[in-house]
Amino acid sequence: MLVIGLTGGIASGKSTVARILERLGATIIDADLLAREAVLPGTPAHRAIVAAFGTEILLPDATIDRKALGRIVFANPDARRRLEAITHPAIARLSQARLAEARRSDAPAVFYVAPLLIEAGAADRVDDIWVVYADRETQLARLTERDGIGRGEAEQRLAAQMPMDEKASYGSAVIDNRGTSEETERQVVALWKERIEKNPR
């Protein structure tokens, strides 16, 4: 069973590529979904986040207000490091369990979709890395539209991540997602045929 890390910068199009891969038959494990699960009310990570950042980052139902917390951590590198020290180990535990389960399945490949795959030191959990690439202006345009934030806040979020060109250097495959959805799909299908269908494991 081949486990491939799918990573890329914020708003580069990882979810779009993951949906294409799922249609092709891949099993998808999404680190963003695991991150939400890891900080549900009652979990140790939830308690640690509230202790570190206060109850003002909670919604009325006691779940974490991701936008409020995001405004804090993207503006303050120390706060971001404090948050990551809490969340990364919790996400790692969940992802290791899901990956172990997925390795026992009969899917042709498992893709672990993780924006911080490299930064979180999780690259050793996968057999290969594919990077979804978009240039800075494309990322900014998508991020402001998707999250309803201003350009300044979008730039802060980009600045908090590894530069896209550096991240691309870690991939054995780079999917250029600056063009149309059809162009992206053609690249993904070609990679699937070349890397997965021709090399079943």
From Swiss-Prot:
Report the Gene3D superfamilies cross-referenced here. Answer: P-loop containing nucleotide triphosphate hydrolases (3.40.50.300)
One molecular function GO term is: dephospho-CoA kinase activity
Q: Where is the DPCK domain positioned along the sequence? A: 3-201
Q: Which Pfam families match?
A: CoaE
A GO biological process held by the record: coenzyme A biosynthetic process
Task: Give the metabolic or biological pathway.
Answer: Cofactor biosynthesis; coenzyme A biosynthesis; CoA from (R)-pantothenate: step 5/5
Locate the residues binding ATP.
Answer: A11, S12, G13, K14, S15, T16
Q: Catalyzes what? A: 3'-dephospho-CoA + ATP = ADP + CoA + H(+)
Enzyme Commission number(s) of this protein: 2.7.1.24
Primary site of residence: cytoplasm
The superkingdom listed in its UniProt entry is Bacteria
Q: Which UniProt keywords apply?
A: ATP-binding, Coenzyme A biosynthesis, Cytoplasm, Kinase, Nucleotide-binding, Transferase
From the Swiss-Prot or TrEMBL record, give the protein name. Answer: Dephospho-CoA kinase
What species was this sequence derived from?
Answer: Geobacter metallireducens (strain ATCC 53774 / DSM 7210 / GS-15)
The record lists the lineage as: Bacteria, Pseudomonadati, Thermodesulfobacteriota, Desulfuromonadia, Geobacterales
| Gene it is expressed from | coaE
